[in-house]
Amino acid sequence: MNSEKNSISYRDAGVDIEAGDALVERIKPFAKRTMRPEVLGGIGGFGSLFEVPKKFKNPVLVSGTDGVGTKLKLAFQLNKHDTVGIDLVAMSVNDILVQGAEPLFFLDYFACGKLDVDTAAQVVQGIAAGCEQSGCALVGGETAEMPGMYPAGEYDLAGFVVGAADKDALIDGSTIAEGDVVLGLASNGAHSNGYSLVRKLIDLSGVDLESDFYGRPFRDVVMAPTRIYVKPILKLLQAIKVKGMAHITGGGITENVPRVLPEGLTAEVRQGSWEIPPLFSWLQEQGNITDQEMYRTFNCGIGMVVIVSAQDVAAAKALLSAEGEQVWEIGRIRAQGAGEAQTVVV
């Protein structure tokens, strides 16, 4: 091997192994708080081991992956990195939840040009917080320092979740019928979708991100983390026959609800049947956005849709309210008209 004085190291090329090691030590306590008894082994192995919980008699594994999108651009602009990790977890765990799956474990991918240990630790602390809210274990991840790939101070995130449900308890929407009721659970804000438009409207309006917006700094309103519905919904599934659910993400209400409806049925959602947060009214006003565009771009205050029989509405609302969720009866399922969309807002 060459041992000349002018040899070049990996660090000289822009990859700081010591910084990566320091990050691992910083985040170990965060990950430890998320552990479940089914986790076998600790952080640092080549693979993560997880024993399927014995409570599942005929388990089906359900997986999901997602990112945070251009909401990260606002995080860079505001130097606010403590909540985007919650967003990352929420986007995946809420997705598999709609099929009746309990999230079991989560992995993350953090990519940057130059690793800033403090920033990365804030992000991972948020990921761990999201995992705690979801009851799933943060069992591993990848930190990729790639010089020249990202602008200074920027990074990208991806998350991966695996959950499980008993095969006969999977929810696919196939039992949804005319007369069923559409319940909407409140969102925390824009969650993690529509942020390319949000950022454009912020730029066009010239709004001061530090200004007061209905009693909160505007920056906190637009950066509010995606709500995680796992624990309340899992309790609901134990008590009530849920026919279908939709996580309201990219595509808004009108594009996501149809994903769980059988052919020939339409969800008729009643405009004004729930409280729309001021942020969405502000966005609509700044961009002169049509109602139709709002409902297919943003969640407009509804982060999760639950479809149940009319006879189960009162019990479902009571249980969800007791778990801290704000829930409204926002529509009904009916026969689909000729040429009609599967979700309409009237």
UniProtKB/Swiss-Prot annotation:
Q: Please provide the record's keywords in A-Z order.
A: ATP-binding, Cytoplasm, Ligase, Nucleotide-binding, Purine biosynthesis
What do the Gene Ontology cellular component annotations say?
A: cytosol
Pfam families, sorted: AIRS (PF00586), AIRS_C (PF02769)
Report the Gene3D superfamilies cross-referenced here. Answer: PurM-like C-terminal domain (3.90.650.10), PurM-like, N-terminal domain (3.30.1330.10)
EC numbers: 6.3.3.1
Q: Which GO terms describe its molecular function?
A: ATP binding; phosphoribosylamine-glycine ligase activity; phosphoribosylformylglycinamidine cyclo-ligase activity
**GO BP terms:** 'de novo' IMP biosynthetic process; adenine biosynthetic process
**Annotated localization:** Cytoplasm
Indicate where this protein is primarily found: cytoplasm
User: Which reaction(s) does its UniProt entry say it catalyses?
Assistant: 2-formamido-N(1)-(5-O-phospho-beta-D-ribosyl)acetamidine + ATP = 5-amino-1-(5-phospho-beta-D-ribosyl)imidazole + ADP + phosphate + H(+)
Give the record's pathway: Purine metabolism; IMP biosynthesis via de novo pathway; 5-amino-1-(5-phospho-D-ribosyl)imidazole from N(2)-formyl-N(1)-(5-phospho-D-ribosyl)glycinamide: step 2/2
Enzyme class, broadest EC rank: ligase
Identify the PANTHER family for this entry: TRIFUNCTIONAL PURINE BIOSYNTHETIC PROTEIN ADENOSINE-3 (PTHR10520:SF12), TRIFUNCTIONAL PURINE BIOSYNTHETIC PROTEIN ADENOSINE-3-RELATED (PTHR10520)
State the family named in the UniProt similarity comment for this chain.
Answer: Belongs to the AIR synthase family.
* Official protein name in the record: Phosphoribosylformylglycinamidine cyclo-ligase
Q: Can you name the source organism?
A: Methylobacillus flagellatus (strain ATCC 51484 / DSM 6875 / VKM B-1610 / KT)
Task: Give the source lineage, highest ranks first.
Answer: Bacteria, Pseudomonadati, Pseudomonadota, Betaproteobacteria, Nitrosomonadales
